[in-house]
Amino acid sequence: MTSQRTRARMVERLCTQGVTDEAVLTAMITVPRHIFVEEVLASRAYDDVALPINFEQTISNPFTVARMSQLLRAGSNPGKVLEIGTGSGYQTAILAQFSREVYSVERIGPLLTRTRGRLRELRINNVRLKHADGLLGLSEAAPFDGIILTAATPHMPPALLEQLAIRGRMVFPRGTSEQVLCVIERNLQGYTETILDEVKFVPMIPGIWQR
C-alpha cells in the first residue's frame, strides 16, 4: 500500500475534491506519505484521514495538506516560506517541492529530530529546521513570501504578521473548539483576511516542550 500507484490514486481523489494546482498535485505524488506516519499505520498512509504521530500531535489528512498548499502557492512558486509546526514533516516536504526555501519551526524536539532524518532520506535539502516557540516566528529569516500554520490559534500572533512580506500570504486555522481555515494577504495598505472552510487542528501551544 505504499506504491507509486497508491499515491496516484490519492492524487486522483484530490482532483475530485477540488485540488487543481499542478505543482501541488506533483508534490503530493512525489512525496511518500507513508515515510511520515508511524509504521503500524503505514497501511492507512494514503487514506484521507489524519493520523496520530505521538506527543498528542497528528499528521493532517492529504486533502488538508494539499488544500493549504494550494492556497499558499496561489498559482506561483513562493521564494521563502515559514512553516509553524513541523510535526511529522510531511507538510514541510510538500512545501519544499515548490518553494525556494522552507523554514520550519517546531516546539517538540523529538519530532524535529525525526523530521530531519526523513528529509535527509528523501534528499530534500532546501529546508531549515529550528527548535523554538512557533508563536514568535523566525525574525532572523524574515520577511517570508508565505507563512503556514499547522496548528490552530484564536488570534494571529503579531510577530507572524510582521514577518509576512508585502504581497505575501499566510494560511492558518483560526479558532479553538470551532475552527475555520483563513488566508491573510499583506499589501502596501495593510492586511486582508478571507475566511474559508471549517477545519479541525490541534491547538497552537506557546513555549518549548519540556520532557
UniProtKB/Swiss-Prot annotation:
GO cellular component: cytoplasm
Domain of life the protein comes from: Bacteria
Keywords: Cytoplasm, Methyltransferase, S-adenosyl-L-methionine, Transferase
Active site, UniProt feature: 60
Enzyme class: transferase
Protein localization: Cytoplasm
A single GO BP: protein repair
Transmembrane stretches, start-end: none
Reaction catalysis annotation: [protein]-L-isoaspartate + S-adenosyl-L-methionine = [protein]-L-isoaspartate alpha-methyl ester + S-adenosyl-L-homocysteine
EC code(s) of this entry: 2.1.1.77
InterPro entries per UniProt: PCMT, SAM-dependent_MTases_sf
GO molecular function, one term: protein-L-isoaspartate (D-aspartate) O-methyltransferase activity
Entry function: Catalyzes the methyl esterification of L-isoaspartyl residues in peptides and proteins that result from spontaneous decomposition of normal L-aspartyl and L-asparaginyl residues. It plays a role in the repair and/or degradation of damaged proteins.
Protein family per UniProt: Belongs to the methyltransferase superfamily. L-isoaspartyl/D-aspartyl protein methyltransferase family.
HAMAP family to which the protein is assigned, alphabetical: PIMT
PANTHER family with a match to the protein in the record: PROTEIN-L-ISOASPARTATE O-METHYLTRANSFERASE, PROTEIN-L-ISOASPARTATE(D-ASPARTATE) O-METHYLTRANSFERASE
Protein name in UniProt: Protein-L-isoaspartate O-methyltransferase 2
Organism: Nitrosospira multiformis (strain ATCC 25196 / NCIMB 11849 / C 71)
